[in-house]
Amino acid sequence: MARGGMRVGEVLKLTPNDILDRKLILNDTKSGKEQELIFIPQKVADRLKEYVRATNIGSDKKIFPICYGAARAMVKKAGQLVGIRLRPHDLRRHAATFASRSNVPLEIISKVILRHSNLSTTQIYLGKVSDAEAIRWIENLYA
């Protein structure tokens, strides 16, 4: 979720059949489209494929056969281990913020990573800027 900007529900629906090279094929999407493609880093694709092989998951079975509550609890616990409050959707927000801070164009973040139909929805995700970050950008802009 943090690398691909996926929604927790999308992750929980994934099957081995949905993995195609460096892409994930999402069916029955929130947007109402029949299918959507998600581009993922090669390392993530490799780890997913390794996990599927190691656990001998059937091609039409869910890769992560847990409910939303269990996924939420896992993410929350991971956050507690590092001393932060963390929810599944925060990982999606992180993907957008990381891409933005890596100078990925807003249109790519919106249409490819988050798959929003409206750019203004993406801007809500990226609207929170710390004072330190604002000062750094202003200093660099007018240096």
What are these regions (language model features)?
Residues 30-32, 113-139:
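Catalytic-site neighborhood detector that most strongly recognizes the C-terminal catalytic loop/helix
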Residues 4-50:
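Conserved tyrosine-mediated DNA breakage-rejoining catalytic core shared by Y-recombinases
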Residues 1-7, 97-98:
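Short pre-functional
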Residues 31-50, 57-77:
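C-terminal catalytic core of Y-nucleophile DNA break-rejoin enzymes
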Residues 57-61, 72-112, 131:
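Short, basic (Lys/Arg/His-rich) helix/loop patches that form interaction surfaces
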Residues 23-25, 58, 63, 87-90, ...:
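Conserved beta-strand positions that form and line the central face of beta-propeller blades
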